[in-house]
Structures are given as C-alpha cells and as structure tokens.
C-alpha cells in the first residue's frame, strides 16, 4: 500500500483477511499476461497451492477448465479480481456449511453417547 492509501488505525481481523485475499490474488495474477487478472494456468496454481484442502476434488485439468469457464463472466479468457472472488465466496459458503454440518454431527454423536451412558 502506498502512504496515501494506508488505514488510520490497526486493522480488524476481517480487514486483515481481506488484505490477505488481495495479496494472494496478486501473488498469482502477476506471473504471466495481464498483471491484474488470472490466466487458466495461474488459476490452477492458485487452487493447487492456496485451496488444496478446501478443493481436494479439483485435481484434473477438466475441473480447472470448468471452474475457469464458470467464473469467466465476460468470456475474455482471463479472470478479474471480481471474478475470482466468486470462487472465494463459493468456497467460503461451502466451508461454512460444512463446518456447521460437522458441528451438528458431533453434537448428535455426543448426545447419543450421553443417552447410552445414562441407562
């Protein structure tokens, strides 16, 4: 960030997370072609290196191609920050739902154990 663009106070947790998302996008967007968009190759690398745990099923080029096609709203064969954010949003929502599912399943499991032990 340039001096004129710095924030006034310390960043909140959410603001830090936003900065990390922007920084990670730029780590990959600056590798080839336009410095502020992702090519198919840059998207593949970003998914492999930064979303490996959350997108375990995305292993092959066909999956990458489909994700790229789904995100490339203006069909210009590159992904803007806004287009990549659609992927981040989808992964975040899916992760949130998965965590709740795991939490609910764990509580049900514990609840069943309590009933079994109280007999």
From Swiss-Prot:
Domain EF-hand: 23-58, 59-94
One annotated GO biological process: endothelial cell migration
Molecular function via GO: calcium ion binding; calcium-dependent protein binding
UniProt entry keywords in alphabetical sequence: Calcium, Metal-binding, Repeat
Presence of keyword Metal-binding: yes
Tissues in which the UniProt entry reports expression: Expressed in v-myb-transformed myelomonocytic cells.
Binding site residues for Ca(2+) 1: 37, 42
GO cellular component terms given for this protein: cytoplasm
InterPro entries: EF-hand-dom_pair, EF_Hand_1_Ca_BS, EF_hand_dom, S100/CaBP7/8-like_CS, S100_Ca-bd_sub
CDD domains: calgranulins
Residues that, per the record, bind Ca(2+) 2: 72, 74, 76, 78, 83
This protein's name: Protein MRP-126
Organism: Gallus gallus (Chicken)
């Amino acid at each position: 960030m340039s001096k004129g663009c710095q924030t006034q106070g310390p960043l909140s947790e959410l603001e830090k997370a936003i900065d990390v998302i922007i920084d990670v996008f730029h780590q990959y967007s600056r590798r080839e072609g336009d410095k502020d968009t992702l090519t198919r190759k840059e998207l593949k690398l970003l998914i492999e290196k930064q979303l490996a745990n959350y997108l375990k099923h995305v292993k092959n080029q066909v999956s990458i191609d489909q994700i790229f096609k789904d995100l490339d709203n203006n069909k210009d064969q590159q992904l803007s920050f806004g287009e990549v954010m659609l992927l981040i949003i989808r992964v975040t929502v899916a992760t949130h739902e998965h965590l709740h599912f795991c939490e609910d399943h764990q509580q049900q499991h514990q609840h069943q154990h309590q009933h079994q032990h109280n007999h």
